[in-house]
């Protein structure tokens, strides 16, 4: 009998796992970019395959959502945001509107406990209610100055059909005091469904928040609207930053009587027409196909970050980190007093080194990852000279007294053991230094194969790779070769790939031997000269 119970238990677990992602098999319609793929952000994604009600909220709900607004505001017009009107029935989220008396309504709402930030794709599958109320899937920053409306629909339109047949796709930028509101206007913000009311069926509503100045809207997997820089913040409410802040996700319904007709108490009491049904919500980040640029603790073994501003260029395959990137799966634990600059591409600077994060304060960068040994490469430098920059990892000093001249970029790497699922990197400045300044963080798991290869080449995992490490492209060059200094004429240079295979052999004819990199795929190689080896990283 016990075996039968166990069998039923495992079947239950299996069914729960299968149902956990109701969107399986539905591709993300947005393009993540060359060499990139979509990675699910589980902490803000939900199939709602559990029961939840006020006073009975399971961890599946409370770990991700709260049934209230981001602050104490109770809603627009005749709205009263109220927790009992947000519930789940085992397969869907219900956002309900019910009569509150005196012409007002109790309205359901949920707000994410975890924030999202571009680049990110977010989508729900939902069916709006048959009411004059607004049904909305949107995002809002803590300071309430930046809002993205992925969808805002009105299920019925008393006296006409115009609103019922159109879906509002928009965004807002605000000044809070004195209150000033901008949102784009015109027919392009109201997507027409060919005459069919949106309330008649479930639809998928998505938005790719690509960067601070680009929004792509999708309905049922089709791109229906793109918003670019000219429309994002033409009145400069945000001081030129665009939609750049980390933001909460909100799903709610609203009785917007400040500009819409009010729902009657009788209409609100009709349970067949007063529920905004949400089947699921899914959120994705673009990450490198190879694992480079990945940012979650899902077994990825490589994480590549290009540090800069919210809008500066990002090296292909890398993920942006700005001075406002707060630690979630990755980022700064404290963003106070961290600056960012884009120095431009003059003097041959490439997109890795043109932009930086910097600070005079000690700051921690964290990365969620699986336990193991990792090689961490950091690129230091700026258009100004920097002194005595230091890095510690997992509480151990790894790099000290790193100095760079004006316009010089230096890469240093080290290995570190992680046993708590999170890598902590501490950046600081020693005596005589003003700020630390970095352009890149590259984290790669060290496998047993790579350890054996290093040992075979006369290196150990503990050996620091300092001036003997090459990076291609060179920060100030774009030629398709690297130069190996102090080469012995008549000897041979052998290049191995990370699997230990010989990929090139060159006879040395110059003390500064040039090696062509034509045909080299991106990755890590090892240059061997007279028994001495060094890394070559081709990007």
From Swiss-Prot:
Pfam families: AGA-YXIM_GBD, Por_Secre_tail. InterPro entries: AGA-YXIM_GBD, Beta_agarase, ConA-like_dom_sf, Galactose-bd-like_sf, GH16, Secre_tail. The active site is at residues 147, 152. Induction: When cells are grown with the low sulfated agar. One of its GO terms (molecular function) is beta-agarase activity. It is found in: Secreted. GO terms for biological process: carbohydrate metabolic process. Its main location: secreted. Monomer. Belongs to the glycosyl hydrolase 16 family. Cleaves the beta-1,4-linkages between beta-D-galactose and alpha-L-3,6-anhydro-galactose residues in agarose. Cleaves agarose in a random manner with retention of the anomeric-bond configuration, producing beta-anomers that give rise progressively to alpha-anomers when mutarotation takes place. This is Beta-agarase A. The gene is agaA.
């Amino acid at each position: 009998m016990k075996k039968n119970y166990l069998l039923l238990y495992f079947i239950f677990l299996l069914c729960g796992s299968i149902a956990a992602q109701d969107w399986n098999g539905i591709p993300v319609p947005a393009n993540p970019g060359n060499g990139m793929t979509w990675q699910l952000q589980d902490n803000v994604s939900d199939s709602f395959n559990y029961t939840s009600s006020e006073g009975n909220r399971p961890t599946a709900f409370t770990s991700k959502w709260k049934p209230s607004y981001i602050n104490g505001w109770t809603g627009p017009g005749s709205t009263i945001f109220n927790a009992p009107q947000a519930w789940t029935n085992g397969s869907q989220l219900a956002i309900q509107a019910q009569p509150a008396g005196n012409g007002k309504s109790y309205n359901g709402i949920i707000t994410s406990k975890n924030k999202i930030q571009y680049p990110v794709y977010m989508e729900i599958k939902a069916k709006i209610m048959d009411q004059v109320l607004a049904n909305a899937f949107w995002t809002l920053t803590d300071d309430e100055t930046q809002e993205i409306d992925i969808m805002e629909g009105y299920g019925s339109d008393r006296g006409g059909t115009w609103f019922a047949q159109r879906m509002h796709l928009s965004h807002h930028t605000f000044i809070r005091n004195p209150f000033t509101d901008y949102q784009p206007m015109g027919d392009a913000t109201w997507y027409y469904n060919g005459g069919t009311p949106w309330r008649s069926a479930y639809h998928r509503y998505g938005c790719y928040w690509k960067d601070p100045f680009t929004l792509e809207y999708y309905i049922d997997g089709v791109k229906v609207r793109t918003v670019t820089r000219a429309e994002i913040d033409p009145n400069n409410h945000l001081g030129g930053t665009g939609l750049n802040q980390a933001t909460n996700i909100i799903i709610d319904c609203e009785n917007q009587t400040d500009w819409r007709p009010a729902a009657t108490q009788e209409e609100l009491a009709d349970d067949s027409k007063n529920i905004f049904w949400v089947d699921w919500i899914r959120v994705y980040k673009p990450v490198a196909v190879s694992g480079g640029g990945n940012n979650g603790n899902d077994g990825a073994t490589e994480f590549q970050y290009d540090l800069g501003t919210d809008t500066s260029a990002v090296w292909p395959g890398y993920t942006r980190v700005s001075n406002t990137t707060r630690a979630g799966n990755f980022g700064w634990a404290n963003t106070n007093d961290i600056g960012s600059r884009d120095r431009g591409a003059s003097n041959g600077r490439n997109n890795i080194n043109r932009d930086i994060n910097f600070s005079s304060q000690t700051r921690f960068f964290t990365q969620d990852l699986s336990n193991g040994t990792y090689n961490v490469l950091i690129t230091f430098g700026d258009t100004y000279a920097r002194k005595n920059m230091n890095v510690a990892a997992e509480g151990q000093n790894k790099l000290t007294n790193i100095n760079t001249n004006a316009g010089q970029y230096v890469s240093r790497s080290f290995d570190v053991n992680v046993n708590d699922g999170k890598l902590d990197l501490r950046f600081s400045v020693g005596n005589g230094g003003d700020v630390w300044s970095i352009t890149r963080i590259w984290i790669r798991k060290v496998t047993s194969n790579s350890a054996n290869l290093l040992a075979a080449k006369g290196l150990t995992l503990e050996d620091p790779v300092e001036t003997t490490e090459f990076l291609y492209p060179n920060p100030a060059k774009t030629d398709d070769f690297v130069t190996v200094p102090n080469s012995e004429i008549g000897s041979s240079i052998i290049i191995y790939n990370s699997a230990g295979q010989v990929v090139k052999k060159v006879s040395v004819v110059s003390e500064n031997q040039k090696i062509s990199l034509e045909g080299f795929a991106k990755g890590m190689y090892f240059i061997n000269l007279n028994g001495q080896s060094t890394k070559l990283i081709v990007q």
